[in-house]
């Protein structure tokens, strides 16, 4: 309702997690199950952080970006594993990585990581609705932080986004 008032459309949330629904102007009539950060949450900060950290731990991310990550977070690979597997709220920890990556969008590796994450959201979530016939609007910290890239990915699907808000 916050994004559409009395208008029908597809509402999408991209933050720590992700979700989407079709709102008919009065109520939510369809929802694609989010799946959480382990089984879904495509496009979210947690999934972006998960893929980046996986690449960091395997030495696949660019050396400069990895070095900056370890310096800024003051964390070792073992502490990364501890934060993900043994501490509370690993999804929140993973999501904090997305804010770090926002400073590196000019790096081809980071840019492709973001693009892939957002494309997966559109493919696995948005495309399950009648998306060509309704407006699609986004809310959430990740959607807002990556708005230019989000608009680019939406354009690849023939979608023009008119609203991207940080908070509802």
Please report, for each region that a protein language model flagged, where it lies by residue.
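ATP-binding/phosphotransfer module of carbohydrate and carboxylate kinases, centering on a glycine-rich
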Residues: 3-4, 8-10, 53-168
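Phosphate-binding/catalytic loop of phosphoryl-transfer enzymes
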Residues: 1-66
């Amino acid at each position: 309702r916050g994004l559409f008032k009395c208008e029908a459309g597809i509402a999408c949330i991209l933050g720590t997690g992700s979700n989407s629904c079709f709102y008919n102007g009065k109520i939510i009539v369809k929802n694609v199950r989010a799946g959480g950060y382990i089984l879904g949450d495509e496009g979210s900060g947690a999934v972006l952080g998960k893929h980046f950290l996986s690449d960091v731990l395997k030495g696949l991310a660019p050396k400069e970006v990895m070095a900056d990550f370890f310096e800024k977070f003051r964390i070792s690979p073992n502490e990364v594993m501890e934060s993900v597997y043994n501490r509370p709220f690993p999804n929140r920890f993973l999501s904090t990585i997305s804010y770090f990556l926002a400073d590196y969008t000019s790096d081809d590796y980071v840019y492709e990581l973001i693009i892939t994450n957002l494309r997966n959201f559109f493919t696995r979530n948005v495309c399950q609705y009648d998306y060509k016939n309704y407006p699609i609007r986004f809310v959430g910290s990740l959607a807002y932080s990556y708005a230019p890239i989000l608009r680019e990915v939406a354009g690849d699907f023939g979608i023009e986004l008119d609203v991207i808000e940080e908070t509802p």
